[in-house]
Structure formats: C-alpha cells, structure tokens
Amino acid sequence: MSARVLMVQGCTSDAGKSTLVAALCRWLHRQGVAVAPFKPQNMALNSAVTVDGGEIGRAQAVQAQACGLPPHTDFNPVLLKPNSDTGAQVIVHGHPVATLDAVGYHAYKRTARTAVLASHARLVERFDVLLVEGAGSPAEINLREHDIANMGYAEAVDCAVILIADINRGGVFAHLVGTLALLSPSERARVAGFVINRFRGDLALLQPGLEWLERETGKPVLGVLPYLHGLQLDAEDALPRGPVHKPQARLRVVVPVLPRISNHTDLDALLAHPQVDVQLIGPGQSVPPCDLIVLPGSKSTRQDLAWLRAQGWEAAIARHLRYGGKLLGICGGLQMLGEQVHDPHGIEGAPGSSAGLGWLALQTALQPHKQLHRVGGRLLPSGAAVSGYEIHCGLSTGAALARPLLQLDDGRSDGAVSEDGQVMGTYLHGIFDHPAALAALLAWAGLADAAPLDLASLREATLERLADTVHAHLDIAALTRLTLGEPACAN
C-alpha cells in the first residue's frame, strides 16, 4: 500500500488549516477510507499524549479522532514548544531532544527532515490517504531554506496542495495571489486550488471576485466555507476571542492567562458549560470576584510565577481565598501552589529556585525526564470517574500529597487537597473532560446541581458538522480526484 497524499497550506496562521484537515479526515473516514493525518512540524504549547508514549500537537490528536484513530507520534514527528521569545523545546517522535534558539533550530532542520520523512514513509505504507497540514504560510521567505513544514515537504514527497485563506480577516484575494506569486514555479504547479474560509454574507456578491481569482491565477476555487459558530474542537494555541454571553451562568470562574500558558484545552468543558461564566484575565487586569480561580499549565513555571506576582495577582488570590473562594492548579499551576519550585538542571531556563505561592505543602523539582502518561482514575472522595493525560517534568513531594485529589487506575495517586478543602492541585490535564468529574468539581466550586455536559460527544458532533459542511460547500468531485483518483500533481 502507498497512500495518496494531499496537503493543506494556509496563507497565514489561523487560516483554517487544522479545521479543514479535520473536516476532510472525517469526510473520508465516513466513506470507509483508511485515512490518517500528518503535520511534519508543529509549533504549539497545547499537546496530547499518544498511545506510543510520546506527545504531539493537539490538532493532530483531533484529526486522528476524526479518522477513528488513536493519536500516534508519527502524525506529528516534530513539535516545537516555545519556552521563551527566542527558544523552544524540540520534540522529535514524541520525545524532547534539545532546547534550541531560532539559529540553533535552523541548523537542526536537516536532522528534523530525516525524522519527518521517516514518519511519512511509515504512514504511506499503512493508509490509503494521508491528509497533511502545513504550518503558518509557505511564503515566509526567511524560512524557506531547508523547509520541512510546507512546500519543502510537498516537493520532497511530490504531493498536491490546497491553499486556504481566511476572508473574515480581510484581504483574502491579496493573500491568495500574493502567496502564489512568492512560490517557485514548481511549487505553484502543486497548488491544486483554493479554499476560502469563514465567509459571512451573500455568496452572489463574492462570485465576481472568485471568477477574477480563477482568471488571474489559473487555479480553481474549490469552495467557500461559511463562518461556523460554536465549534467544539481542541485549540492549538488561540484562546477564545472575547467573552461569551451565558444568560444561565451561575458559577464564575477566573483564569489568569500566563505568558507561557500550556494545554489551555483543560478549560474547554468550562467554556462550553452554559451555567459557567469563564473570564480570562491578562496583563494589567485585576482579579474580579468569582467562585473559582484556575491556575493553568505553564511551559515555564518559574517565569510565569514571577510574572503572576508582578501583576499583583498573588494578593488578589489570597483575598479570594479569605472570602471562601476555591482555587485549582493544573500541572504548572499545581507547582505554583506549592512552597518551592526548583530547577537545578535548567530545564525551563536558568537553573535556580523560586518560592511558590505556599497554599499547598509541597515542593517541586524539575527533572530532565518528562512524564508522559494517558491515565484514568477517580476523584477523591466522590469516586467520580476521570480520564486525561500527564505531560510534566516536575517531581512533587511534601505533606500535602498525603491528601491526594485522584486515585489513578495504575495504582498511583495524584494531586493534593488543602486541609480546609479550598485549594486543589493536579498533574492531570483534561480533569474537567469526563462528565462525572466535571459535575463533581463544579459542585465543589459551588454549583451543586450543574447541568450534565459531555465534552467528548460535543467534539464528535463538531467533527460530523465539519464533514457535512465540506460536503455541502466544497467541490466534492475535485476532492475525490485529489484524494482517491488522479495523479497528485495535475495542474
């Protein structure tokens, strides 16, 4: 077996590449096609743990779900997790290999390319179709040398490319024509057509522009996707844009948005719940009155802890607790709740130690070996089922661990609860995802009769909706030829 390969590249970041690939994955999966996702190189702080014990970008985990597959490290062989403005942890085939600045990674690209092509070779032998997501834009002139994320990959494996652009942000024709103009002749020949994303309005008013675009470029418009509201898909990086009005909200949750916040998909169930009002606060904002504060994960715990203090939020959180509010820390947030965070090996920056917030009697030492686990278990003492994953370098010890939050199915306990029950911490990402765990945690926070919410069912419904949208709005005959029929590089 040797799979047909189709790649989706975008004119910009957040053009809709991840969503279109997920939609196409589910569209093909519904037809019984053996399809798999692939992203050669991803940069994201939201990651997922795979069945083979590594980590990949969350978008590829969602795309795997759309294909009816468990996530695997081959679906995203190179993952970059930024830990500063100029550096990132480099994860290859699911495991960290180095922390490099931009210059260092540029030199490393040849090695990364070998890893990318090795994963590609394995996947094309296992599946009938490989749907590939590019990264950012293929027209970044300064990044073209040794490119493995966009056209460099497409040229290496000889695949066709769909170019997607977001009309909602404006300038869609300039984006498409400009991107095409900056490609080499051989790269332009790979572009099989355009998809315009997030359209609102009367399509008849757009039609003259589409006809001009096809005449100007000689490339077909494969379809115009509407702006879809209420999608329940794991985000790779972007947090929700603006507040969501919830007339039925009865529980107020505040989340400090840290500079290196990671795995904020932990908040998805709260954001989706009609009775929970989630307020994300950023620099310069005060902590408003609320029932629950959630300290999220962080790729740089000590640096984000210092930043939190600089905002004046430590005193605000202490005031929140004095008035009976609840506080939950997840992963890096758990580490911040302790008494000390030690980084003797310089895992997240310069070696050193930082005083924690001191609301849980524990200390954390960052270790070179990263813990990666997919786990299930139960909340204590309620017994509510939980499922999720661990991604952390920290090893926590201390008296607070004698009051664990979770009993895991593998025999370990996890997390800690303060003596007064106001403060909880856990290493488990996805702690709100299971309906029973969500109900129990909302009851602890003050919403005793919360309406049931099943996040997994919402995600499945979204994937079905995306597949329906593709079928209704894209050129299905052309997509069928590209994925199942004609030679890859037909002009």
UniProtKB/Swiss-Prot annotation:
A GO molecular function held by the record: catalytic activity
CDD domains in the record: CobQ_N, GATase1_CobQ
By its UniProt entry, which SUPFAM superfamilies does this protein fall under? Class I glutamine amidotransferase-like, P-loop containing nucleoside triphosphate hydrolases
**Residues annotated as signal peptide:** none
- Which GO BP terms sit in this record? cobalamin biosynthetic process
Which residue positions are annotated as catalytic?
331 (nucleophile), 429
Domain named GATase cobBQ-type: residues: 250-437
Highest taxon of source? Bacteria
Q: Which Pfam families match?
A: CbiA, GATase_3
Keywords recorded for this protein, A-Z = Cobalamin biosynthesis, Glutamine amidotransferase
Family from the record? Belongs to the CobB/CobQ family. CobQ subfamily.
Q: Which PANTHER family match?
A: COBYRIC ACID SYNTHASE, DETHIOBIOTIN SYNTHETASE
Q: State its role.
A: Catalyzes amidations at positions B, D, E, and G on adenosylcobyrinic A,C-diamide. NH(2) groups are provided by glutamine, and one molecule of ATP is hydrogenolyzed for each amidation.
Q: What is this protein called?
A: Cobyric acid synthase
Gene designation per UniProt: cobQ
